[in-house]
Amino acid sequence: MKAYSTICPGCGLGCGLYLLRDSEKGEGGERAATGKGMSILHRKQSAVNAGKLCKFGMQLPHFYSRERLRTAVGGKNVSEEEAVKEARERLTTFRREEIAFLAMPSTVTNEEALAFLSLVSEVGSENFSLGFERFFSVADFGILFRGMPLEEVERAEKVLLFFLDPFVQYPLLARRILRAKQRGAHVVDVSFAENERAKGIYDETILAEEIVGDFVKDMLSEGEDLGDVASAVARALVGGGEKLENSLILADLNLLSPTDFISAAIFLAEETKSQILFMKPFLNANGANLLSAAMNMRGRDIFEILNDVERGKIKCLFLLETDLLYDGGGVDGTALENLEFLVVQNAFKSAISEFADITICSEPLFLKKGTVVNVEGRVLSAGGDAQRTVEILERISGAERTYKQVQEEAWKHLGISKLNEYESFVAPASIASGKKRARKVTNKEKKGVGAEKSEEEARKDALTQLLWQKTSPFFWHAWQTTRRTKRSEAIVEISPSLARRLNLFKGEMLEIRRGGESRRVAFRIAEIPSYLMISTDKVTKDGILVRVEVEKAK
């Protein structure tokens, strides 16, 4: 039995734990990491979570039991050296504007991010993304990637949750809010619906429908999105007096967040003289993006890159530990048809690796040597000693630096002098100076909704709902399970009113349609507004709050 002191890759917190693994070696020796024969011990000395784990963290042995990716060229198993050589040679056959590089920083360490960015620089392409470039036009790095020790959440006198459900999205954050409440903090939830999980914790719930009802209603007919509603809510809250001043605002920043939503959250913080902490679903989102800032590499919006892939402008794609079919990219296999060359470097087989021309197997996080910077700004160790991912990237780029050289450069860029999870923090202000201010949140002219509607329009409206997807760690990973058994169907919460309108009975299914696609889902009844459906599963890939058509499944 071998023990690994590691961190969970489920979200941006990086909760500490021990993984116990059978000493028996599988196919490929120690590289054949598997969840079989693996168990978890709680690491009570962890600075982040004091040993507590959420549902995702408790099921990491299942997460690591996924099938390993084979190192192959054209579907044929080859040595790592052959695959690296072929990838390097093929990359040189494309013009730099035809090549794109994507890495969602979930299991990518700082050292790997630096090697990845060095490869991008060597190729000379501006087509790269770490997932968050779209938000750089909204505010400076110091706001977007500012960390805050979770102890400050516990010490806050006022906590405002801005369309964030910590009980679903970041359960270990919910524990900190509960402690703040026990210490006398006033906790306010700004949301679309009352949170049944938080009874007795929230002092006040401010419903969007109650203060900006017109915007919410217009989402059913005019195409408003979460950003529009959030902007209207922020304006209304700012005009509500001093009760929210000097709060700690908690909001989520992820690939699907509208830029207007982020602007609204920052505007609210500035106008109420409050602090703001953006939670993030990817473990090393702060570290990787601050590293790119320190290297003066800003990249492009991931969705712009994917559009260029679909249009055929980008012909070559390199994916580092990223599955676009699950990581929020909102693409399917048909979007990759115009690609001429696809390289996937990952630890596990994924849906998108099936399309790859070259696949290169790397190590799972718990075996890696390296560091990450979590949402607190805290520097954490991945816990292992494997250096292969860095070495592979260095060989593809031709730089061939040693791991130690790469680590020293990454630490220098981030201002890391030592690795101590209790004391080591990264300060964004020392990396990227703030030149941008949150965009002004302005009133949006309303078109109005006609009082009279045709029978066909009325029928359509009766089946039009807003789907609010609460993005738990399971949402962002190509793996989903209940406590003990896997399930394939998503579950949505619906109002009693919608159940009556659709004449639904227990055991029946819903069909949800959006953008020409449909999906069958299970349902459960909840006390939520009649216009709303809520899911903690991934039902659609193109938004957090989206308009859908719903009917009883045939």
Where are these regions (language model features)?
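Glycine-rich phosphate/diphosphate-binding loops that line cofactor/substrate pockets in enzymes
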Residues: A83-A100, P149-E157, V233-L248, T272, ...
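Conserved short loop/turn motifs at secondary-structure junctions
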Residues: A100-T109, D252-S257, T322-L325
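Internal, active-site/partner-interface "lid" segment
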Residues: G227-A232, E400-I416
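A generic structural motif
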Residues: S125-S137, G184-A193, K273-G287, F341-K349
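A glycine-rich, hydrophobic/aromatic-adjacent loop/helix-cap motif
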Residues: S247-R311
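N-terminal export/assembly segments and adjacent metallocofactor-ligating motifs
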Residues: M1-G227, A499-R501, F505, R520-R524, ...
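A cross-kingdom feature strongest in bacterial/archaeal respiratory oxidoreductases
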Residues: A3-I7, G29-A32, E157-L161, Q169-E196, ...
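Short alpha-helices
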Residues: F192-A193, K199-V229, L253, F261, ...
